[in-house]
Amino acid sequence: MDVDEPNPIVISDSEATDEEISIIYEPEFNENYLWAEENVQEASRSQKIVTERLSLDSTAGESCTPSVVTDTQVTTGLRWSLRKRKAIQKMPYSLERIKHRQLLEGYDISSFDSISNQLTLPKNASTVIHSNDILLTKRTGKPLDEQKDVTIDSIKPENSSVQSQRYDSDEEIPKKRHRTFKDLDQDIVFQSGDSTEDEQDLASTNLQNTQNDEVIFRGRVLNVRTGYRGVLPRVAWEKSLQKQQSSKVTKRKTQLLNHKGVAKRKMNRSAHIEDEEQNLLNDLIAPDDELDIEENAPPDIYLGNLPEDREANEKELKELQEYYESKYSEDAQSAGTSGFNLNEEYRNEPVYELEYDGPGSCISHVSYKDQPIIYLNSRHSDSGFSEQYNISAEDNQSVISLDAAEEHNDGIIDKMLVKPKRIKATNDANFLNTKSKRVRRYKYKYRNSCLAPSTKAIKVGKRSAHKSHLAANNPVSFVSKKNHVIDDYFFEELESQSLEQDDSSSLKPQKKRRKKKAPIYSSFSADLESRRKPVFNTVVEVPTNRYAFTKPNVRNRDSINHDMEFEEEDSNQELGPIMVVLDSILLKKPFEPPNFFKIQLSDKSFLLSKLNPADIATSLQKIFRVIIDKGITDTELVHFNESLIAFLVHLDMPELFDLIGEFHREFRSKVNSLRKKAKPIHFFQIAACQLMFLEISRYNKISAAAKFDMDVKLLDHIVSFFKLLSVCYDSVMKNPMQYLYTSYYILSAVVDVIHKKEALWDLFQKHPFSPHISLLLVNIFPTKVCRWQVLRLDSEFQPLSSAFRFINYCIETCNWNVTNSLILSLDRIFKRRRFSDFEEESDLSQNNKIIYPPTNQLTSRLMFNRYLHLLTLCELSSSDTQRVIPMGDISMNDSLSVLKNRLNLLIVLATRFDLNLEKRFQELTRPLYSKEYLNLHTQNTVRTITTLIMQASLSFLEISRIKNHPFSGKFIASLFDKLVLQQPSISGVTENFLKEFTNLVSKMKRKSVSMLKFLYPSLVAMSQENIFESSFFLLLQVYLKSLDVLGPTWVQNYLFQFIKSKAQENERWIECYCQIGKFLVDSGIFTWWTFFTYNGLDAALHFQLAFHSLIIDFCDTDSFELLKKPLYSIASDLLLISKDDAFYHFLSNLLKRAHIIVADLKPVSDENELLRLAYIFSKALKKNAYQDLLAVFLSLAKKHYDEGDISRNFLAKYLEFLNKNCLTELRNNQLFISLRRELGISSDEDEKCAFWDSFNEAGDILSKAAFVETGIVQACCTGNEIDGYLDNLSTLFTSTMLESPFAFFSDLVIAHIFENRPFFDVNIKNFLLSHFIDLFNKVLKMKFEQVSPDEFAELCKVYRALCIECATDDTFNSNSDLIAAKDAFLVSVLRIADGFWEHDKLLQLRMLDSNMNIPNQIPHTTLQSSLSAIVIKIIESNIGKIEASEPFKTFKNT
């Protein structure tokens, strides 16, 4: 520690306010510990805090520590002391032992002598008190021996003695410390057992009557008899104790300004030198782990409270106890489950962590507000790196070195006393869950959670079992910088792994950007935004004369910033001066460079001083020569560079540029000669030279032109840096990378300072680099301008794979566009390889597919597929597109990958650009059809080739469909002719191809006629092979769906004749034949009659019936009427004998087309089913008035009866059916008459025939109505004839004698509802009307209420008339028979209307009554009026007979 350096600053132990400080112990003030201070402002601030507090308490308490001085004079200003004895003079043996220990631990002890000479010691030594037990009592003005009477009963610990240790031994002794709370009103007794050695040491003293006391001094438990070891000579120690015992200590308030225990901040210290000296100073204080501390030590020993103080602070201590009990009881419970997650942010709060040494320890609870804390302003918060630090699980348990000096201020200690421990970090953020990973070491661990300056509480002692509550879970936030990201992912992961082939990743479209990771290395500009003013100070702590408990600063508690953590002393502090220099250059921040610096290289020492500028160049040249010729350690090199960089600021010696430039050239040349032995530290030196060049170029003596030239040279040097790195890359990557990362950052910052990033990229493009180096460049010097020329493309697999990973990264992360130059460069590589895959990709190559559909993305990660993906992301010009098209033919020796890649390339180009590459596709596949090529390959290979061409053909067909391009399809004809037909074994592949082919052709708006005509010979050839039957009909479907495109002439001349010749063989052919015949009929080539008569089939009956069935389905209505009778004739010939399914299918189609309601017919199993089928067919013949066909069918029945095909019972039942339903058509047929006589069929039906004859002879409608009306009047008068007559009338509804039977009888019924009231009895009208209603009910029941729309309309007319008549005629409702007949009719009509819109209206009519406004008469039509007159006339002429008849009388009386 250099005490002669200027600008020390005094900082108190605690930055607490006055009211937060309670004086516990105040030893004698010794100004030998004060250092000279020049920074008055910082000193005044610290002095003010202490002075104000001391003004409240003017009396000093009695000391409980070994060194007590009472005669202290305190002043308010700076006080200087005379020269005192140095530590080397007072403690030569101790310092020699410390020096030896440091040497064994590997520390640089070159400055040990200067440090030890500058240390000062207290002038007064204490004397050892010979006592076994010392009672700590209330403070009084009496001596210690007079205070016994005022003590309170002691509380002894559980273990009455603790074995003392030999502190002069080099062996570490584990400490034991146990604390517990006792009653605050009791005295505290600290006892320990005496060892044999201690008794011998105390034998020569005069204090045998006192107890063996142990006290707490600066957080350490000291034995008053052995506490001098390592601190003072024994004589001085005993003398101090004697003086303490005899002195009067008065309690007074004093003003304390500069005193012991005040930390002093040394300004502008070199971080590297400070770190070395700090490690030496750590051992000047005996570590706590060499002490034996009695278990269950009273807490007042630590707190230093005497009875007077406890009486005054009883309330405060009670609050203290309650707070810690509530706070740490919860922490203890959660300690087992709380983890240490490095992905979380540190909460910026002080650390209060109690030590825990084992289950037997007893931890005392201390108040939060009284917790002694030493706050330090972090001197490393200005670093340029912002890097998330990782700590291994092992280091997490022992962050603080066990060799470090520790103060047991309840777990808090100044960080300067802690020896930095080497910290390891892993690649993975979740490293705690892994057992072994690659170790990464970072120099600076920067956590910038807030921008405001803050202090940091430093934790002391070993890691407690209780996890720190500052272990955070939130990710570190950074201030981002535009266009400049130096990402740890890309420096760590990408350099080692990301450029290796990864099957799980693939290139993504440019539109889908990957979410960027939060950078671990923040940019230089971002640091400039977030850093505070750089202040580099060393904080040193010396023994204090006052102890205070500090309340937490609640206001700033949440904003305490944990800026940095440290790792190794040789690498932690490299960037401190570097970043300060960059700040001074870029931000014009004030920076006071050192006036000189001294460096020790090997056995030589060099001093560079501004007071002797003439020797600077010479000394530098000598230093450079030592570095070049002999070499130095990494630590020395880093220390030299940071010292020189800081020294060069404002030196204003431009001549050093050439000197450093010569060193830079030689050093770089030597590194180039090393190559495989190059290390990151070498590149750190080269980068440091660039920063030196930058400093020199900013000198005042440098002209603008010279500055410009220097900047140009600086850019050249940076390019040379990466050129050299590319040469030594493999060897450098085998070493820890922290120095290399540092060099990256320096170069990035330098380029930002000179604002020549784009000029640098112009130089980079002139010297292409490997993908690894290129990846570094885009991360160190990010740019959105596409700089693909920086990438060197090689045709080897691994470099090319890395190149594609680099390209992918630039596209997704850097937003670079794919340019024509990049595509053409890659195209040249693949063309040299004839578009074949690499041997390393053999497995992927075998599984590679042809792109189909063409819009699909390739999933295979083959190199060529990555290239194809890039093609989809660029906009090639027409000329460049032509250059990319593969023009060469496939040779005999080319692998299948050549065919796949070329086909895929054509498909991508045809899809992405407006090109029709069908011709090029045909040229590409032509050599594959040669016999020489096919004979050279195995059957499986030929099968694969055929499949590839088929898939490519489908893709080109789809592209033509999407873009509506003309498509000749010659290559498809060649495919079938040369490959498909020559390989019957691939019929399954062909079938799958034709399924897709048929689907695509059907979707095409512009169907290719030429393609179909080219394929026609292949179609005919495929029909000759049974193995291609399924494929043939799939291909034939293409023609059948394209008949209109092919035209009727070509279809008739080629396709129709070809299909007709094949139609005799298969029903599928017949269906195709009929489809083509329908097309030709629709085109007017011939008619259905011509097609049925002259183009029929001469094949078997089964095929003929199939042909007839299709004719029935395809022909139009008019053609069917012409063909219906011949088709019925065919059916009548086969009905009684055929058992073929084709016949029943034909008969079903025929009857359905003739509107005969019938289910699908199946072959009959017995005569009853055949008889029902004969009934249906006979009705169809009757309906179509085919009496001749009905007579023929009867004769066929007689013939089959005679032959025994049908039974007598069958014939008899069939004749009964004909006698009942077809008597009119067959009554003059002699065969019918004879068979009826032979089989004994009744002739009652003849009466019906006579009725029909009379009815037909009546003439017009009015005459027929008069005939019916007369007949019903006569039948009513007769009595028993009415039912028979109604049966005869019902036959009129099923015969053809009336055009519309329902209309005829509905008018006749309405005619009985007279417009004017007749002169005869109305009951006669109602009597006749009831019989007509019974007729309708009989007919509806016979027809199962199944009527046509016209018939339903007629029924609705009758329904309306009856409802109105019922509502208006009182006599209508007086007869129950009439009402029953009427209601039955209305219900039947409503049932028929159910579900139709008429139903509601009919229901409303039924609800009419006499109270409604209803017309008394129903208006009649002309026909109805005429019929009404005829009815009245007939009734009037037969009124006497009607009234005398029994049926009428009965009706009238009901």
Curated annotation (Swiss-Prot):
Chain's gene name: MMS22
Top-level taxonomic group: Eukaryota
Family listed: Belongs to the MMS22 family.
Subcellular location: Nucleus
Annotated region (Disordered), positions in chain: 159-178
The protein's assembly and partners: Component of a cullin-RING ligase (CRL) composed of 4 subunits: the RING protein HRT1, the cullin RTT101, a linker protein MMS1, and the substrate receptor MMS22. This complex further interacts with RTT107 and CTF4 to form RTT101-MMS1-MMS22-RTT107 and RTT101-MMS1-MMS22-CTF4 complexes respectively. Interacts (via C-ter) with MMS1 (via N-ter). Interacts with RTT107.
Pfam family, one: Mus7
Protein name (Swiss-Prot/TrEMBL): E3 ubiquitin-protein ligase substrate receptor MMS22
Species in which this protein is naturally found: Saccharomyces cerevisiae (strain ATCC 204508 / S288c)
Keywords from the UniProt entry: Cell cycle, Cell division, DNA damage, DNA repair, Nucleus
InterPro entries in the cross-refs: Mms22 (IPR019021), Mms22_budding_yeast (IPR013220)
GO CC terms, sorted: Cul8-RING ubiquitin ligase complex; nucleus
Disulphide bonds in the chain: none
GO BP terms in the entry: cell division; DNA damage response; double-strand break repair; double-strand break repair via homologous recombination; meiotic sister chromatid segregation; nucleosome assembly; recombinational repair; replication fork processing
Sequence segments annotated as region (Required for interaction with MMS1): 1201-1454
Protein role: Substrate targeting component of a cullin-RING-based E3 ubiquitin-protein ligase complex RTT101(MMS1-MMS22). RTT101(MMS1-MMS22) promotes fork progression through damaged DNA or natural pause sites by stabilizing replication proteins like the replication fork-pausing complex (FPC) and leading-strand polymerase at stalled replication forks. RTT101(MMS1-MMS22) ubiquitinates the acetylated histones H3K56ac-H4 at lysine residues H3K121, H3K122 and H3K125.
